[in-house]
């Protein structure tokens, strides 16, 4: 079953948004996710958050630092990317300045990643240098079990505070609190997705709050534990259509193996 993904896309020149919002039914991995309904936060509150950037400094996806030289992100963020043209900014509340910028020496995504179903939407980047923990740079642990439905989690990233007619895109890190919805519940009649939710996914939901079109690949966290990776969704912050994330516990073995072998 093919999925129609409707996205709110802020048309941009370089890294600056022109302020026009439209809709697109393009391939899911073409989107650049943005936090919807979030609030300003600081990197000190979420020091594992990183920005994936082009050589020119344009933010295109989020990611999570899991050890001194490994970043976890979504597979769809890495498809078609040349390692020499991907950089990671760490330790900054702003995606366009501050912190440190590190080159990437290797990247990989799950060999079972399916751009049609969005199953196994996980990838990693190996940094060109080891990064020590500081006040604003911390490693996040990988969850071993998916939290129960109803557990409060936080999604972070850079993006708009609205879900329609977004006139500006703040450069400050955003956070939004949502509630975990396990994959079986998300695939049930209680929500609208049905059979397109798979066991490599986990959902999270709160009315008018979501991770949507730059936040792709970013963290869904409970405490200092990474439970999900921003993957896809139908529209943004839509009623009974939760945001869908790659389920870290389900993909943990691949992440650890790839981290050790790259």
Curated annotation (Swiss-Prot):
Its main location: secreted. Gene3D superfamilies: Trypsin-like serine proteases. Transmembrane segments: none annotated. The record marks 210 as: Required for specificity. Residues 20-34 form a propeptide. It is found in: Secreted, Extracellular space. It catalyses: Preferential cleavage: Arg-|-Xaa, Lys-|-Xaa. Disulfide bonds join 61-77, 186-203, 212-236. The active site is at residues 76, 121, 216. Residues 35-260 form the Peptidase S1 domain. InterPro entries: Peptidase_S1 (IPR050430), Peptidase_S1_PA (IPR009003), Peptidase_S1_PA_chymotrypsin (IPR043504), Peptidase_S1A (IPR001314), Trypsin_dom (IPR001254), TRYPSIN_HIS (IPR018114), TRYPSIN_SER (IPR033116). One of its GO terms (molecular function) is serine hydrolase activity. One of its GO terms (biological process) is proteolysis. One of its GO terms (cellular component) is extracellular region. It is an enzyme of class 3 (hydrolase). Keywords: Disulfide bond, Hydrolase, Protease, Secreted, Serine protease, Signal, Zymogen. Its EC number is 3.4.21.4. Residues 1-19 form the signal peptide. PANTHER family: AT20289P-RELATED, POLYSERASE-RELATED. Belongs to the peptidase S1 family. This is Trypsin theta. It comes from Drosophila melanogaster.
């Amino acid at each position: 079953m093919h999925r129609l993904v409707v996205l709110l896309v802020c048309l941009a020149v370089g890294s600056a948004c022109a302020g026009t919002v439209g809709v697109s039914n393009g391939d899911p991995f073409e989107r650049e996710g943005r936090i919807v309904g979030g609030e300003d936060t600081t990197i000190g509150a979420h020091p594992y958050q990183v920005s994936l950037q082009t050589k020119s400094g344009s933010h295109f996806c989020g990611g999570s630092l899991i050890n001194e030289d490994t970043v976890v992100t979504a597979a769809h963020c890495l498809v078609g990317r040349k390692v020499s043209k991907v950089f990671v900014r760490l330790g900054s509340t702003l995606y366009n300045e501050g912190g440190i910028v590190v080159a990437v020496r290797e990247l990989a995504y799950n060999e079972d990643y399916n751009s049609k179903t969005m199953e196994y939407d996980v990838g990693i980047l190996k940094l060109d240098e080891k990064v020590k923990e500081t006040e604003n740079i911390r490693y996040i642990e990988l969850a071993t079990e998916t939290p129960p439905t109803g557990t409060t989690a936080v999604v972070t990233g850079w993006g708009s505070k609205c879900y329609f007619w977004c006139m500006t895109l703040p450069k400050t890190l955003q956070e939004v609190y949502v509630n975990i919805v396990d994959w079986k519940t998300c695939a049930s009649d209680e929500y609208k997705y049905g059979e397109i939710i798979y066991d490599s996914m986990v959902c999270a939901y709160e009315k008018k709050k979501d991770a949507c079109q730059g936040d792709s690949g970013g963290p869904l966290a409970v405490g200092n534990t990474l439970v999900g990776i921003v993957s896809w969704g139908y529209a943004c912050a839509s009623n009974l259509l939760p945001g869908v994330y790659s389920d870290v516990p389900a993909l943990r073995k691949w992440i650890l193996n790839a981290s050790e072998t790259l």
